[in-house]
Amino acid sequence: MTNLQDQTQQIVPFIRSLLMPTTGPASIPDDTLEKHTLRSETSTYNLTVGDTGSGLIVFFPGFPGSIVGAHYTLQSNGNYKFDQMLLTAQNLPASYNYCRLVSRSLTVRSSTLPGGVYALNGTINAVTFQGSLSELTDVSYNGLMSATANINDKIGNVLVGEGVTVLSLPTSYDLGYVRLGDPIPAIGLDPKMVATCDSSDRPRVYTITAADDYQFSSQYQAGGVTITLFSANIDAITSLSIGGELVFQTSVQGLILGATIYLIGFDGTAVITRAVAADNGLTAGTDNLMPFNIVIPTSEITQPITSIKLEIVTSKSGGQAGDQMSWSASGSLAVTIHGGNYPGALRPVTLVAYERVATGSVVTVAGVSNFELIPNPELAKNLVTEYGRFDPGAMNYTKLILSERDRLGIKTVWPTREYTDFREYFMEVADLNSPLKIAGAFGFKDIIRALRRIAVPVVSTLFPPAAPLAHAIGEGVDYLLGDEAQAASGTARAASGKARAASGRIRQLTLAADKGYEVVANLFQVPQNPVVDGILASPGILRGAHNLDCVLREGATLFPVVITTVEDAMTPKALNSKMFAVIEGVREDLQPPSQRGSFIRTLSGHRVYGYAPDGVLPLETGRVYTVVPIDGVWDDSIMLSKDPIPPIVGSSGNLAIAYMDVFRPKVPIHVAMTGALNAYGEIENVSFRSTKLATAHRLGLKLAGPGAFDVNTGSNWATFIKRFPHNPRDWDRLPYLNLPYLPPNAGRQYDLAMAASEFKETPELESAVRAMEAAANVDPLFQSALSVFMWLEENGIVTDMANFALSDPNAHRMRNFLANAPQAGSKSQRAKYGTAGYGVEARGPTPEGAQREKDTRISKKMETMGIYFATPEWVALNGHRGPSPGQLKYWQNTREIPDPNEDYLDYVHAEKSRLASEGQILRAATSIYGAPGQAEPPQAFIDEVAKVYEVNHGRGPNQEQMKDLLLTAMEMKHRNPRRAPPKPKPKPNVPTQRPPGRLGRWIRAVSDEDLE
């Protein structure tokens, strides 16, 4: 997580900024990585109360821009009247191009009294409406509270002196940058001409069927007959466009129509009026078209628009009183609100109504808005921008917290005093290491703790050695959410989810889909779809897992298991390795949900939970045990794992179970044991030694068992127990020293148990090995894959590479690592391996070879982009470069391979010219010609600079052009007689003689004569 302040505090800046915007902005930790700058903008307004003492403040809490809201005063006739818009202190479009809102909060209160008033009267109602402003049906003081049923989105009768606080909470996390409607360079004859670039993302479109064979009939009146053809609700506070057409038909000669569109504000007044048609004559017997094509810029929308109206005025040329006028109309139009569907742009809205406040009082609106801003090119020259950091843990934690905001008491509207008191609680929510004292007092502690455990990086930061717990998301999170989690199809995830394997080439592991498993601990025998009843526990038990601690202080023995996937019975593929602990008793609550409900019996009839119910374990135990996966071992504790691991099979844990049954240690034994006990008390060898050894070493443990392990205990059980420190109990009861002989016909269960040893040479396995060798001889790629696997196995990093593959499913990180790895002959290679690295001469490729490699890289990159004609040979003929824009356009239009070194300029649009002003050219010429105080640049030099701007289509000089201009300036300065005279060179400083030290007042200086 980001922004660590000290060892005890770990803050999530984004959620802190959301809940407490006054603490400042923070980058949104999503995957939209744009260089931006963070900025806090304040909004402060003193609103004067009208004659009725009532008013309404409309806030747009999620609007990504300068608009904050609007203020309306209630008139004596019961209607609202628009007062003014509420904006941020700075006009953002003047300096910035793009914006994302991070957080916002606003406070409304009154603390001033007009003359003659001695008491502060009035109350406030506030509500957050999950809709647009035009959709409100009752905006009266009391009716406002019926806009929502959510108790956390409304408050009533708050004293105006106490005030209310409006908090902006995100409604979506899929947020892109929004164009702010900033001005763009343009030249026009009209001095008021303005050109802006508005947002075109996520528009809101209203489609209105204005008329469907509507019949109009009336008698002639002087001045015409006016009707409202339609009126519809729309919402707009940014630029909009209106398009469409109406078709009129008439049988009356000389009819004249006029059409006017009105955009009406929330108070019912016309904000914008546009005449669509004036004195438009209709021709009898034909279709008369009336097109609509209107653009309304943001600058003309001075208050929120909530409806649109179209009026038709009908008249008749030379008409007389009593003349009949009739026509019919059909058609529709569309109103497009630019950026209207961006989350938070028009919905939700927060309305704050005040009532019975003294006339002339001042209602203060103050708040802060935090933004991510991308500056315009001029400001970007002097403003440093930075990339946002993608932090999935912080983003996941924020989403989890806000998804439970109703249960956690997080509101959108607050009494100001209550919001101030909750700031300490918000700090606890944002601090991942806080003890949640205040949250516990409110009863929110258990919820927040559960969300912290689900949020992946949080567990790793609370318990640094518990980083592997980060893999518990996915299916594990779905299990923890219990029966409330559902898949996209609507069915429970527990019945439809599948765990993912290491990469796309390995088949997905079936967990709960058919209540079976294909994850085995050996490479010899795979059960054929054994039925496992009750893999998933009840939802109540699963929800209880929220309260489990990660650390368990209990005696245990440890053993590693290699988990593999299988395509069929003879083609296994290694996937992962995991450490398991043997604990005494029935402890299914410590197991992951995927392992619960499954057990196997021993020869004595006792159960071992966590094993697949296939056969019996060839052990005689005196009690019941549970096998649980773990992620680490501390001094006297083990760290449990919630990875969705199915029940295990095989005999890797026999030695650990036997040791646990005999000695029953009080603390975990810090040695991993592996081996299978047979009927003669001997410990048989196992496979995947290096993989299990690497698993043990990763946890800081040694591995014990037969073979070349850290602790070579031999193949005899008696020798094994003598080399371990233990506290023997019931020493005379060691059934493994004198295990009775079991005949071969003891039954299928014993045969399966004996066959479950992890590795045995069989004819089938030998045949499979020969088949792989034959395939490697034929397929070089398969040979390379086997070589890589052998290299991983020899170095003991198979498990590490498998875990890395799980975290890098698309191999992006691996490709970047290989691309940036030091090559033979590089400086880092010579520094590490000397002049010959890896046993070969450390020299780089030849120029020809390097050029061929470059051509190949360019070709592969083009191939990933779907440009298949750019083969390495074509790239070499094209001057060792990729296709130009003209070549790409030629290929896209003709689907023919373009000729190398042919630019096809006819297929490329000419670059648009942009004029540069004389002032801009003069400033550039002055800056290049010399520093301030020197001679002004001559006209000839200004003309040279103007030529550069003309060549560059209005842009400044590049580096080469700048060098030429500097040389030209130097030549002109030497030829200019009016140039400033050169400054004289400073004379070297001659050190002065050091004055004699000051003698005391009564001390006489000693001369040479005195010394003689």
Swiss-Prot record:
E.C. code: 3.4.21.-
Alphabetical UniProt keywords: Capsid protein, Host cytoplasm, Hydrolase, Metal-binding, Protease, Serine protease, Virion
Oxidoreductase as UniProt keyword: no
Annotated stretches, region: Interaction with VP1 protein: 1003-1012
Region (Disordered): 971-1012
Domain Peptidase S50 as annotated: residue spans: 513-755
Active-site residue numbers: 652 (nucleophile), 692
PTM comment text: Specific enzymatic cleavages yield mature proteins. The capsid assembly seems to be regulated by polyprotein processing. The protease VP4 cleaves itself off the polyprotein, thus releasing pre-VP2 and VP3 within the infected cell. During capsid assembly, the C-terminus of pre-VP2 is further processed by VP4, giving rise to VP2, the external capsid protein and three small peptides that all stay closely associated with the capsid.
GO cellular component: host cell cytoplasm; viral capsid
Function: Capsid protein VP2 self assembles to form an icosahedral capsid with a T=13 symmetry, about 70 nm in diameter, and consisting of 260 VP2 trimers. The capsid encapsulates the genomic dsRNA. VP2 is also involved in attachment and entry into the host cell by interacting with host ITGA4/ITGB1.
Protein name (Swiss-Prot/TrEMBL): Structural polyprotein
